[in-house]
Amino acid sequence: MKPFPWKCGTCRQHGLVPAVVDYQTEIAHDGRVYPLSLPALKVFQCERCGAIVLDDEACKKITAALRVTAGLLAPEEIRRGREALGLSQEQLARSLQVDQETLSRWETGGQTPQRSMDQLMRIYFRVPEARRFLEETATFSTDLNQPPSPA
C-alpha cells in the first residue's frame, strides 16, 4: 500500500482516519459464497463519505476468517503438516504436483488453496498409502522450464 495518508477511493479526498467497525461481507471462493462477519475490525474510514478502506492487516484477517468459515487448512497447519513429515517445500510441492512458489504462498497466507487441494493435503498428511502413491506418481516438474518427467 502507499504511505499514509491515502485518498478515499470513493470521493477521492484525503481524510481517511483509523476506525474500528463491525465488518460484514460475502466472499466467493472456489465456486461458493461465504458470508463473513468480523466484529471490531481495524480499518480506515473516510471522514467525508464514510467509505471503508482495508489495509493489508485487515485483508489478512478477512482471509483468515474465510479459511475458518470454509473449513480450510490454516497456513500454519500446512507448514506443520509438511514439517511433521520431514519434507521440504520442494518435496511436498512435487508430490502435490504444484509449483513450490504456490505452496510457499499457501504456507505464508498469501494465497488460499482451492478446496480440492486442501482435501488432497489433508489426505497426504494423514494417509501413508495415499502419500506413497502421490510420491510414486509425481510427474510434475517444479521447474516450469523443464518438461514433466516420463511416468
Whereabouts are the PLM-identified features?
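DNA major-groove recognition helix of helix-turn-helix/homeodomain DNA-binding modules
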Residues: 115-135
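Short recognition patches in nucleic-acid-associated and regulatory proteins
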Residues: 10-38
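Short metal-binding segments enriched for Cys and/or His
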Residues: 34-63
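Residues immediately within or flanking Cys/His clusters that coordinate Zn2+
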Residues: 3-5, 43
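A short, Lys/Arg-rich alpha-helix, primarily the initiator
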Residues: 59-83
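Helix-turn-helix/homeodomain-like alpha-helical modules used for DNA recognition
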Residues: 133-151
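Short cysteine-rich clusters marking metal-coordination/redox-active sites
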Residues: 8-11, 46
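Short alpha-helical DNA-recognition segment
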Residues: 87-104
